[in-house]
Regions:
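Helical "substrate-binding/catalytic lid" subdomain
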Residues: 166-288
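NAD(P)+-binding Rossmann beta1-loop-alpha1 motif at the extreme N-terminus of oxidoreductases
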Residues: 1-63, 94, 125
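Rossmann-fold dinucleotide-binding core
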Residues: 97-175
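Rossmann-like NAD(P)(H) cofactor-binding subdomain of soluble oxidoreductases
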Residues: 51-56, 60, 68-133
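Hydrophobic beta-strand scaffold residues
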Residues: 27, 47, 116-117, 158, ...
Length: 290
């Protein structure tokens, strides 16, 4: 499989497309705003005028868009991916969406004779460029095997988890961890600073224990300094938090901590922090604790 399409060129989608181009795949890409296509075009990718055109020129189309509504928009309709099927097309959706929505979208694709996989990932643009994403995949196992070379190019670990929707559930559980880690780290730093303790000492102690995380080692010092390399915005994480709480409601389960965190992130966005990195939730805590 050499002809791969990418629909959606946000920070992650663009990085995935660049990785594939640089690895020798024939990439056709689409984005609503053309400014985001310039670098890819210079690197050798073909730029399509519609998702349909991407599908017409691809064996596999990877979707990387914001939410389920955006997935449906690029997938179905006159200029959607489904209408570009030239036979044996596979669609792989990297977007973070509700598992039940994912299953419904898979059925719509199946009705059009197209196999669809869920392939949400962990890791940002820099990780994607290096081919070091962690991928959770679900859907038809045969279709997954056909795409394995592509997936192994963008991810250093790929987990096949079963039927459609399962990978989406695991992705939501992973983003729940991210949410709580960022908030707990922010509250810990805020507490020690207000206690006249150097937060760097707090981090040194934390990172000397079993409780250290990649976030506490790689992002926490930037949180103290208020200097962020934005790879995943606070507003995007809030969108995923709402998807988590919605999925929990559908399953009939109570997740009290993420429900409270949703309120905190909503307030942070209302205070103007939505466009900074998700670890910038600490800026909201700084503001309310002056």
């Amino acid at each position: 499989m050499k002809r791969v399409g990418v629909v959606g060129l946000g920070m992650l989608g663009n990085a995935v497309a660049l990785r594939l181009v640089d690895s020798g795949f024939e990439v056709t890409a689409y984005n609503r705003t053309k400014e985001k296509t310039f670098e890819l075009k210079e690197r050798g990718a073909a730029i399509a005028e519609s998702p349909r055109e991407v599908a017409e020129n691809s064996e596999l189309v990877i979707i990387v868009v914001r939410d389920a509504d955006a997935v449906k928009q690029v997938s179905f309709g006159n200029e959607g991916i489904a209408n570009g099927n030239q036979g044996k097309l596979i669609v792989a959706d990297m977007s973070t969406i509700d598992p039940s929505e994912s299953k419904n979208i898979s059925k719509q694709f199946s009705d059009s004779g197209i196999a669809k996989l869920d392939i949400p990932v962990m890791g940002g643009p820099n990780v994607a460029i290096a081919g070091d994403l962690v991928m959770m995949a679900s859907g038809n196992k045969g279709s997954f095997e056909k795409c394995k070379e592509v997936f192994d190019t963008i991810a250093n670990k790929v987990f096949f988890l079963g039927e459609s929707g399962v990978a989406n559930s695991v992705k939501l559980a992973m983003n729940l961890q991210i949410t709580m880690l960022a908030l707990a780290l922010s509250e810990g730093i805020t507490l020690v600073k207000k206690s006249d303790v150097d937060p760097r000492i707090f981090l040194e102690i934390l990172n000397s224990t079993y409780f250290k995380t990649g976030m506490s080692e790689k992002k926490a010092y930037k949180m103290i300094d208020g200097k962020y390399d934005t790879t995943f915005t606070l507003s995007n994480l809030k969108k995923d938090i709402s998807t988590i709480t919605g999925a929990a409601k559908s399953l009939g389960i109570e997740l009290p901590m993420i429900s409270k965190a949703e309120e905190v992130y909503e307030n942070a966005i209302s205070e103007g922090f939505g466009d900074i990195d998700y670890t910038g939730i600490i800026e909201y805590l700084k503001k309310i604790n002056k």
